[in-house]
Amino acid sequence: MRDGFIKIAAATPDLHVADCAYNTSEIVKLAKEAAAKGAKLITFPELCLTGYTCGDLFLQETLLEGALDALNTVCRETAELAAVIVVGLPLRVRGKLYNVAAVVNAGDVLAFVPKTHIPNYSEFYEQRHFVSADTLSGGMESVDIKNADGETVCVPLVTDTIFQCDEQPLFTFGVEICEDLWVPNPPSTALAQMGAHIIVNLSASDEIIGKAGYRRDLVRQQSGRLLCAYLYADAGFGESTQDLVFAGHDLIAENGALLAESKMFSQGIIYADIDLQRLAHERQRMNTFESIEGGVFSFSLEPVENDLADRTFPRTPFVPANKALRDERCEEILTLQATGLATRLRHTHAKTAVVGLSGGLDSTLALIVLVHAFDMLELDRKGILAVTMPCFGTTARTKGNAEKLAEAYGVTLKTVDIKAAVDQHFMDIGQSKDDLSVTFENGQARMRTLVLMNLANKNGGMVVGTGDLSELALGWATYNGDHMSMYGVNGSIPKTLVRYLVAYEADRTLGELSDVLQDVLDTPVSPELLPPKDGEISQKTEDLVGPYELHDFFLYYMLRFGYAPRKIFRAAHKTFAGVYDDATIKKWLTTFMRRFFTQQFKRSCLPDGPKVGTVTLSPRGDWRMPSDAVSALWLKEAESL
């Protein structure tokens, strides 16, 4: 279980009602197939050894004995599999019949887990045959059964108990059965609080119109509420269709996200690679996730390498892949940004808002947000003072785009050529114009901030910052230059998302505005602080610090889920295969780790700005890190990859 990943599987076998021998052969076949693909936890549907739709046959001695014989066969045939297998059967204990899950490992039944909530409404008549787990004395009893060798063994019948792997302590799971999920207080809630990172549900949920969507949402939302993985195996083909139809709707969800789903009315296996470290990190982070005491059964599994074949990592984790969802998200984000800014403008009684408009992505987004905020407040857009400040690195393309944007949005444009002021400043401090050092670059950035701040004072306004989350993570901002403003609207927006927000605005506008926004998107990302070559941008940010799609990927998994460098590298290797080789990924990952630590001092004094997503670097909110923290541990791991 390297890096906390474990493969789990839900299987729907072909069944014959009451034909335990046939059912067992199908279950064993699928169990072996899943184990061969690396699954460590394999679950089957409710009452799968007999079939769920046996009716009054559940009261027949022959069927009950056949179910136990079938369980012994499962134990014997799967004894060599490096996996835990969970199957369903009817089990008689002290004259009462329980609908149970049998947890099987290394040829033994670790325990039986009985169903708690026995439905007896609509099409369900389970109380005709089964009793609830609530009838157990103290929530636990035991039952003597014959094992595969013909020996009598005592197996516990338990509730409020989880199962934990000795070799992989994060591999913990609890079991509930079908209806248990559909009630106001499912057993899985307590099981998760006891420490179960995976909830297994053996189900026989019949299909009616609209139920699949409800079921899907139920599983997904329960996994999110419990910060767990939810493994749901549903009965399917072969169950009696006398009155009902079963679709074999298998589902695997993790922390609110659906990872795998079977095709309706099909048989077979679905898989997912679950990130147990991520789940543990989320529970640790959320101090409101309460823990309670419960029973624990341990089991042993030989650790096996996981190739992550059934795990995907979004290439742009901050940006939804689905266009409809992406557009919806973009609209929501722009509204959040604009509302935050509008509230601040109203509170400060600012008459104007000043923004440095370079013609690049970040300042364009800041202008878009400003326009939305002014429209919200029903203010004249002429109160927006867009300032272009050409200097040594400015190109005609970016300056022209800035001018076109100001005109298209109907805001006030002011041009302040800062070359003379910067020349004088360089003379004052003895800086040669031929020395293209950090002083040459930062002198321009700080001069621009000086101009903006003084214009804001002069016009009774406030400076709106343009820097984005990716730049803050890398420290790609001049301290007390573009780093500083009176309100930063982009501080929670990573560069990959900035691009999509501007593209969204371009898609919903017409004419010249759409054209100029598209040209902004096509312009290389650059601070334009070094002289151009042949009139073209010579200083390209991604050539210097690396591709933003990589840095945003690193940033997301480091901050959101606490991934270590080796785990980030592994995820990036899988995600960017064919795009970047391992050497390139390692190079920029090392750069990211180094810069992230050394540049914290800039983030420790950020201006106010709205939180937009779950990953942000505000020192007053989500990220509180000392400016003098040492990166040695992270760099050592990154450099050793």
List PLM regions with ranges.
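ATP/NTP-dependent adenylation/nucleotidyl-transfer catalytic domains that generate, transfer
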Residues: 169-171, 228, 237-240, 254, ...
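Enzyme catalytic cores with a strong preference for nitrogen-chemistry domains
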Residues: 1-356, 368, 372-381, 413
